[in-house]
């Protein structure tokens, strides 16, 4: 701190950065001080608060010391420098004091006087106000300071950006520490000084206001009951937040009837659920000829006009209840932190005609149980499940679910899963405002504010409807396009269908080469029957998929036509706000044109409502009905698509078990007989559709071969001969016969194996397509145990039969071979 070297008067004491005060640029005036615009030596624009009376100087001196302690604290107006001047004794003004602080763009008081906030702040601005005040009170508590005069006039607005959890363009900061008090760390933090604004006082302080002796010595009056900083500051903040949310204070107050406020707050303390008390007329006293009034409790934050989301109404109700009944800055900080940092999702509801910015408050202690489910927060009756559609996903929400966990996207379209949906009631608009010359200034200003509020609220409502139908159109169009894209890719249907054909074909070689085994034949027949059944189901579902795809394509085009056509009224919001006057002459002189502006807003609203609710040609449906039908159609198509997917899975399950049995049988047979895998793959390849004629010939030849072999064996047995290679010999004994059979089998197998490996294969002519067959087998044959190939394996009954089958299955190419 620097002291002027001159000991003569005036004595000037400065601190911090020097500044210049502009006496002709007053910003505001309070009961004890005035605020002017100023600028520091570095060029910063500041607000300079100054006072010259003894009590004012003392109050500002306390405020300067407290602001120094709070330097850098969150959401507290920042201090830059001060100037204290003491005049010579006998001067008209003995001393003056001033200090420079941050220059605010506006105040909460001025914001609440704007016509658009006549019924309360927007939800985003209210949430930021709650969070910023929480941070300010936490900073005061950290430095052991009680503010003791929190109200909307002592909260300043600074430019902000909706980032990092912020929702509005306002940054709120607490100011005016003239009534504040630094508390000792070792003290009980209890206070008895009567200080504060009359209609925001804690009940302990309100009780003192009705004492007739208090008015004579208010500045030195001490309360009978001590109060804490939490009690007085949170009570005043609760009254302020209620006012900012509804446009009215929670308790009736009359300047000349202090007992009215006192009775209201006492009545509230006796009702633990109340957050406000409303004075209502209950009758009339005939003896005294006066009306009888009583206080009625308000147990939930009114939101008829502001249309706050239900999660916010519940949160604010619980918060105000704690302020008035169980004040706790720690609990307030937890709730405020959740309001800023919890997960947020945006839900657009066509039938409710609303866009809800939902914040997940279900995990906040002592608050989550009072938060309604998401379904109820969106305006649906108890027990209504909902379908949520985004640009990328679809989710079903139970009617009791409160958390947004599992919802990855930010924006969703809501489709209630119920046959009957009640539409949200749209408030009727009344623009009949009469401003007459015989009205008082106050009455005229109230009417003008209501008139401008109606016009601005209609514009806000229109903007919400435009945004709603834009989002609905985008989401529905995208969802239908995604469905078309999914249905155009029949991968599951095609894969399962190919599998069914494969099972059918894979059963053939098992029947060809092992017809003598009844068990194997039964498995093959079962596979074939199941495969045919599954293939028929899949073909039917493929057709259903094509129908759904065609329907989705058409509905996607219809969804693009949901957007509303709007009248362009540039700058009308600012123009309406400029016609808010408090002077009688100004109000009467602008009556006609201000009414024209409001009527223009109504015309724009009627144009939008006409598109939403009425058919354009009495043939086509209205935008609202079309949007609801499209949403329901999308839900139904999605349901049909899910059933289709489930049926495909059932078809695959139907095929899997018998096919696995057949596959195991084939593998066991191959292992037992020692047949080569290459032979199996060749027969599988031969069973492809392009070799259909060859397949028929093989089947016929196989049956003929079996008959010929059986007949030949019978005749040889009757004649008593045994075939040894190309030689028939007489069977001399049973032992000789057995030996002959073994030699015969060995020679036949050896003979045919040499024929297969020999380059000269004229003895066994091949079918016309054998050259193509062999090349394709070598290039792309697959294993029976890997991904299903297009044809099944070849398995012979035994080596002798296999050799004979290969011999007789091939057509003869020359007479010599036939004779042989």
Swiss-Prot record:
Location of region: Disordered: 758-798
Protein kinase domain sequence ranges: 21-299
Protein name, entry field: Inhibitor of nuclear factor kappa-B kinase epsilon subunit homolog 1
Xref: InterPro entries: Kinase-like_dom_sf (IPR011009), Prot_kinase_dom (IPR000719), Protein_kinase_ATP_BS (IPR017441), Ser/Thr_kinase_AS (IPR008271)
Effect of deleting the gene: RNAi-mediated knockdown results in defective clearance of paternal mitochondria and impaired accumulation of the autophagosome marker lgg-1 in 1-cell stage embryos.
Gene that encodes it: ikke-1
Subcellular location: Cytoplasm
Pfam families, per database record: Pkinase (PF00069)
E.C. number: 2.7.11.1
Catalytic activity, as annotated: L-seryl-[protein] + ATP = O-phospho-L-seryl-[protein] + ADP + H(+); L-threonyl-[protein] + ATP = O-phospho-L-threonyl-[protein] + ADP + H(+)
Active-site annotation: 149
Top-level lineage group: Eukaryota
Organism from which the protein derives: Caenorhabditis elegans
Keywords for the protein's UniProt record, in alphabetical order: ATP-binding, Autophagy, Cytoplasm, Kinase, Nucleotide-binding, Serine/threonine-protein kinase, Transferase
BP GO annotations: autophagy; protein phosphorylation; regulation of autophagy
Quaternary context: Interacts with allo-1 (via N-terminus); the interaction is direct.
Residues bound to ATP: 27-35, 49
